Amino acid sequence: MPVIASRISPQSEAFKANAAHLLAQVEKFRSFERAVIAHSSQQAERFAKRGQLLPRERVARLLDHGAPFLELSTLAGFGMHDDDGASRVMGGGSIVGIGVVSGKRVLVLASDSAIKGGAISPMGLKKSLRAQEIAKENKLPLIYLVESGGANLLYQSEMFVEGGRF
């Protein structure tokens, strides 16, 4: 395959400015991802008192030790519904990703019961449906860890599953 010639100069000021801007945006994105984890982790003491693991701990115990986990749709519903995009970043109320269980690549979907009791928001539902599509398209087994209060009743009217999608 021939190499595609480029006229981009990594030493140019424009390139350096664009790279710096991009890295700043990536860090901003990563800070929102960390906020999702922090929001969920605030419930650690409550879960420990009940003898429960936090949802991310359950996912970690499910996966093969040391195997990679590619989390997907980390900011689903960002700035929507009860997610304010600042102090309450919820990631769609679930953890979705591709990992390895017993040596097999799988898609894991875990409701995050540390966020609103695992209640499903409209974007959380879309995140779950998209995870199911990804599993089907890639012939991945789907492991679903559920601990949920059901639909978030404030947004129940927005959560009708589109025809042929469930």
Give residue spans per PLM region.
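Terminal-region recognition feature
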Residues: M1-F166
